[in-house]
């Protein structure tokens, strides 16, 4: 395993490693499971999830602000609930006006998460150049201003062209854009496409930690000193599951590596087994 911690926009930052007490405080056995999604029903639970549709132009951010190519739909061509799992299906259809389609599910206005708590998600990523699966969170309210002032929590994002690596990142700051995160790399045999892994967000008051399969990734316990009263991560956030196609984060998509209507095995789908939140 290999972990690389990255910081963009800082002259200095302290306290990467959580203390033993910090970790114990969140992993106590008396934590209660307060929300879960096991995807065991054959239909999507619309009390928990909504579809965000379009290509971003509807929100004034065509390409979703990252030059992404997909159009998000609520079509059964782009997702399925089977084997007790959610499977997001990024799709290439050369005969459609919407060449690339996918699904983006959000809990916005339905379920919000607040600290302190522990959020864990069991997942597999799709394999294919240009695919960009993500598990992330955005603020319920932009209390401190528009992005990134009110924060963004990326539990997991990955590139379908490199199934040995995932990233966890925090986005924030009042003047410009700063981020703190880490890359986590595994062996070919343990890659994120063929094997399930669990990402855990340990979300405290004034501090955040990420773990993959109980392996420490990155700890943030010093941003309150930098941001003061405008520290955004003590607010309520909602959850997002999606797979983008193309964009600034990934290479240009190869259509032959992406699902088509008549050819799509599970290796090309973003699969989520469960989501659980403890407090």
Locations of the language-model features?
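Sec-dependent N-terminal signal peptides
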Residues: 2-11
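GH16 jelly-roll
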Residues: 16-279
């Amino acid at each position: 395993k290999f972990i690389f911690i990255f910081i963009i926009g800082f002259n200095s930052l302290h306290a990467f490693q959580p203390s033993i007490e910090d970790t114990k405080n969140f992993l106590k056995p008396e934590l209660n499971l307060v929300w879960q999604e096991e995807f065991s029903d054959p239909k999507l639970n619309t009390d928990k999830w909504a579809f965000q549709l379009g290509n971003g132009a509807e929100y004034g951010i065509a390409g979703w602000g990252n030059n992404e190519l997909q159009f998000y739909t609520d079509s059964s061509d782009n997702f399925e609930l089977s084997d007790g799992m959610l499977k997001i299906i990024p799709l290439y259809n050369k005969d459609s006006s919407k060449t690339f389609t996918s699904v983006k599910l959000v809990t916005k206005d339905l379920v919000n998460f607040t600290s302190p708590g522990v959020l864990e998600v069991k997942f597999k990523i799709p394999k294919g150049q240009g695919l960009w699966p993500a598990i992330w969170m955005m603020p319920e309210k932009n209390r401190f201003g528009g992005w990134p002032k009110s924060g963004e929590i990326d539990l997991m994002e990955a590139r379908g062209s490199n199934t040995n690596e995932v990233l966890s990142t925090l986005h924030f700051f009042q003047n410009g854009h700063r981020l703190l995160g880490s890359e986590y790399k595994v062996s070919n045999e343990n890659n994120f496409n063929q094997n399930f892994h669990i990402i855990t967000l340990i979300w405290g008051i004034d501090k955040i930690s990420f773990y993959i399969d109980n392996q420490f990734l990155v700890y943030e316990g010093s941003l309150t000193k930098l941001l003061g009263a405008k520290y955004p991560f003590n607010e309520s956030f909602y959850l997002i599951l999606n797979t983008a196609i193309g964009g600034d984060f990934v290479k240009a998509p190869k259509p032959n590596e992406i699902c088509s209507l008549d050819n799509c095995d599970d290796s090309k789908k973003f699969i989520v087994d469960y989501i659980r939140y403890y407090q």
